[in-house]
Amino acid sequence: MPAFPTLDLDGKLGKMDRVVLGWTAVFWLTAMVEGLQVTVPDKKKVAMLFQPTVLRCHFSTSSHQPAVVQWKFKSYCQDRMGESLGMSSPRAQALSKRNLEWDPYLDCLDSRRTVRVVASKQGSTVTLGDFYRGREITIVHDADLQIGKLMWGDSGLYYCIITTPDDLEGKNEDSVELLVLGRTGLLADLLPSFAVEIMPEWVFVGLVILGIFLFFVLVGICWCQCCPHSCCCYVRCPCCPDSCCCPQALYEAGKAAKAGYPPSVSGVPGPYSIPSVPLGGAPSSGMLMDKPHPPPLAPSDSTGGSHSVRKGYRIQADKERDSMKVLYYVEKELAQFDPARRMRGRYNNTISELSSLHDDDSNFRQSYHQMRNKQFPMSGDLESNPDYWSGVMGGNSGTNRGPALEYNKEDRESFRHSQQRSKSEMLSRKNFATGVPAVSMDELAAFADSYGQRSRRANGNSHEARAGSRFERSESRAHGAFYQDGSLDEYYGRGRSREPPGDGERGWTYSPAPARRRPPEDAPLPRLVSRTPGTAPKYDHSYLSSVLERQARPESSSRGGSLETPSKLGAQLGPRSASYYAWSPPTTYKAGASEGEDEDDAADEDALPPYSELELSRGELSRGPSYRGRDLSFHSNSEKRRKKEPAKKPGDFPTRMSLVV
């Protein structure tokens, strides 16, 4: 009978066990490879404050559905500032020594630290947490966290968590430590977002500040220059070069007008005369403020147009306000002021002392001999002549006189006081009678002749009157004594060397200067003075001449009226006697008179001075043909004596100050 196979059955069972175990291992390895895996390449990252950063995160999964990515923030368990400064606690140091894998700053319960969701992404949608809304934070690529600007509170642990619906195996999270640091040892940038390469930042900032300051200063100056009524500057401004310097006078006047008191700096010129314009300066401030209407302006302001108005400052003031009327008037008057017109009118209206002696300027340039025959105008006629006053006050010459204007006496007096007066007008003058002709050129010529004898007085060759004397009217001496008492010796002893004037019939006598005038009782007495200095008085021929003259009168009547007299014979004596004494005074003669009448007349004439008023008037009444012949012979002798004298120099004539009439 056959046997059972036991050993072959055991061998087949062992082979099957090994195959099952192999397939089990393969399946297990496949499951491990296809599970979810999350990794972070950088476990610790350091970033700068206010700088952007990116936290990297990678994951792998076998699921075909999109994964959900989430970033969480967990703060440190302990402050890292103490570790950096070496101020960690002893307990934390002991725990770290016993467990090397434990970190006291990172490993702790979530209840002991701050946990916040930073951002999450599902598909293409990114959602920020409540604490990070408004910041530049997003999730880029698959799971990278990008932060635009880091803040001081961003330091801590950041966890990357990946969730898939059908892949639940594997490691789905990982963490990275972020440490935010600030710059130390360097100054912070003044302009963080602006880089200046050509200069330091502080220099650039300083230049910007200085430029802004200068800009405001320039704006202030331009505003000041364009508005001179509000302030006063003296710097030229490019905005308004025409208003470079505002006038100080207008500025002070404006301040004074606003304050209500007169200005300290007067901008109104003094009164000046303009032809055909009434005299007077600017009206006072009180008169302007009392009137409701604006002040009057110059006539050229309305008729001259824009060309006649001089360029100047215009004050932006209200014309209706009383406080600004004075300032407005002063400003307008200064703009219209013309110095050339003022000087022209001033010299046209002023009549000088010499030019007023003639009617027009052409006569003043005539020769000396032509002017001698021209008589001065009547002083009384000028006072009442309207043509004269119309020419003077109207500024017209004598040749172009218009119709005479009627000026009263008060207007004439005010005109005289307003005109400038020369020094010669200030001196004392003689009061002449009204209606009598003034001194003509003949008297001035005789006065000039007597004035020119100063140089010959010291040599003893002059027999003219003393220098510095002047002519006086015979009317002014009418109240004096006529020397009716006393003998001829006493009279001719006191009166010496007196030459009669060339025009004796005009009623003028020759008197010494006021500085050398004698007392009133002796002033009319002419004296015969020796011309030789340092010598005793010579023999007086006066008495002998008078005796010979008396004897010659009957002889002249018997001869038929001879004109030769002892006085003329005395004048024809030699130059020696003429150098000591002047010729004797002339007397009047009557041709064909009897001896009795001559003796009576001689007795009366001897009792009177030869230069008295009565003697001259008596001579004029009794003047006949014989007297005219004697006068002509006397003038011929005078002309001969003048020809013998040396010619005078032009400088011998008196100056203008000495010709005070």
From Swiss-Prot:
InterPro entries this protein is in? Ig-like_dom_sf, Ig-like_domain-LISCH7, Ig-like_fold, Ig_sub, LISCH7
Tissues and organs where the protein is expressed, per its UniProt entry: Expressed in epithelial tissues, mainly in liver, kidney and colon.
The family database entries (Gene3D superfamilies) matched by this protein are listed as:
Immunoglobulins
Please give the GO cellular component terms listed in this UniProt entry.
bicellular tight junction; endoplasmic reticulum membrane; nucleus; tight junction
Q: Which UniProt keywords apply?
A: Cell junction, Disulfide bond, Endoplasmic reticulum, Immunoglobulin domain, Membrane, Methylation, Nucleus, Phosphoprotein, Signal, Tight junction, Transmembrane, Transmembrane helix
Q: Which domain of life is it from?
A: Eukaryota
Q: What happens when the gene is disrupted?
A: Steatotic liver with increased hepatic and circulating triglycerides and total cholesterol. Shows reduced expression of genes mediating synthesis and oxidation of hepatic lipids.
Kindly list the biological process annotations in GO that this record carries: cell differentiation; homeostasis of number of cells within a tissue; insulin secretion; negative regulation of T cell activation; pancreas development; regulation of RNA splicing; response to glucose
User: Which residues lie in Acidic residues bias regions?
Assistant: 595-607
Kindly name one Pfam family recorded for this protein.
LSR
Domain named Ig-like V-type is located at: 36-177
Q: Where is the composition biased (Basic and acidic residues)?
A: 410-428, 463-478, 491-506, 628-639
How does the protein's chain sit in the membrane according to the entry?
Single-pass type I membrane protein
Phosphoserine: residues bearing it: 487, 594
Subcellular localization is given as: Endoplasmic reticulum membrane; Cell junction, Tight junction; Nucleus
State its role. Answer: May be involved in ER stress pathways with effects on lipid homeostasis and insulin secretion. With ILDR1 and LSR, involved in the maintain of the epithelial barrier function through the recruitment of MARVELD2/tricellulin to tricellular tight junctions. Also functions as a B7-like protein family member expressed on immune cells and inflamed tissue and with T-cell inhibitory activity. In the inner ear, may regulate alternative pre-mRNA splicing via binding to TRA2A, TRA2B and SRSF1.
Q: How does it assemble?
A: Interacts with MARVELD2 and OCLN. Interacts with P4HB and HSPA5; the interaction with HSPA5 stabilizes ILDR2 expression. Interacts (via C-terminus) with TRA2A, TRA2B and SRSF1.
Family as reported in the entry's similarity comment? Belongs to the immunoglobulin superfamily. LISCH7 family.
- The protein's name in its UniProt record: Immunoglobulin-like domain-containing receptor 2
